Structures are given as C-alpha cells and as structure tokens.
C-alpha cells in the first residue's frame, strides 16, 4: 500500500491519535514532533527515525525500521551521528526535528543542580 493511501486511511482515526483543544497530536513511534501530519508520521512513511531515552537512563536510542543503536557518548557526538544519519539521504527533511529530540532527551538526563541556601543577611536575621 502506498504511503499516501495509508495516510488517507489513518489521518483522522487511529489508536495513537490525541485530539485536544483543537490540536491533533500522535503518540506513534517514529513521530519526532508528535504531530499528526504526513511528514512526521511513523506509520505512513517507510523511512522513519525514532529517538527515545535509553532504558539504562543514560543516552538515547536511535532506531530506524532496520537498525537500532544506543548513543551514550554525550550531546555533541550524539547530535553529530544523528545529523550524519539524516544528512546521508535518509530523510534529510527530519534533520532539525531529530536534533531537537536528541537534545531534549539528553537534557532530561542531566542531574539537577541543588541550589545552595542563601545566607540570611541583616541584624534581625542573625539575631538569635
């Protein structure tokens, strides 16, 4: 079945579709922006890229329909390899979305800095 025909069949009704506040989102694998559009659809297109957090909690899993690779080197090297994958003729139109997704997933894995408690100043604050 062609990609266009598949999209016509699933665009208004599928199990991944979320319709809220006049906007349609999609939870399908391979949809980088989670938007219900033909360009980003993981079901309608043959060539898809799925980027998700690694199960170990460190790194990202980049998967295509044929391969699956876990990238754990850091944000710059991960972004470079994802950009290389998309630039090499494999869905070059998804490059910006893929890089944004890698950056967002890796940003969530950074440890949260604990802010130091501010020292109280003044005569009344130090009076005990």
Segments (PLM) and residue ranges:
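Compact, Lys/Arg-rich rRNA/RNP-binding cores from ribosome-related proteins
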Residues: 1-128
């Amino acid at each position: 079945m062609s990609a266009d025909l598949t999209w016509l069949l699933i665009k208004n009704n599928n199990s991944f579709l979320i319709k809220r506040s006049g906007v349609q989102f999609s939870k399908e694998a391979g949809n980088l922006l989670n938007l219900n559009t033909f360009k980003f659809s993981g079901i309608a297109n043959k060539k898809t890229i799925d980027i998700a957090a690694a199960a170990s909690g460190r790194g990202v899993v980049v998967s295509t329909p044929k391969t699956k690779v876990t990238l754990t080197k850091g944000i710059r090297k991960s972004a470079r390899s994802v950009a290389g994958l998309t630039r090499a003729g494999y869905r070059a139109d998804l490059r910006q979305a893929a890089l944004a997704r890698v950056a967002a997933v890796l940003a969530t894995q950074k440890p949260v800095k604990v802010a130091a408690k501010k020292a109280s100043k003044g005569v009344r604050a130090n009076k005990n």
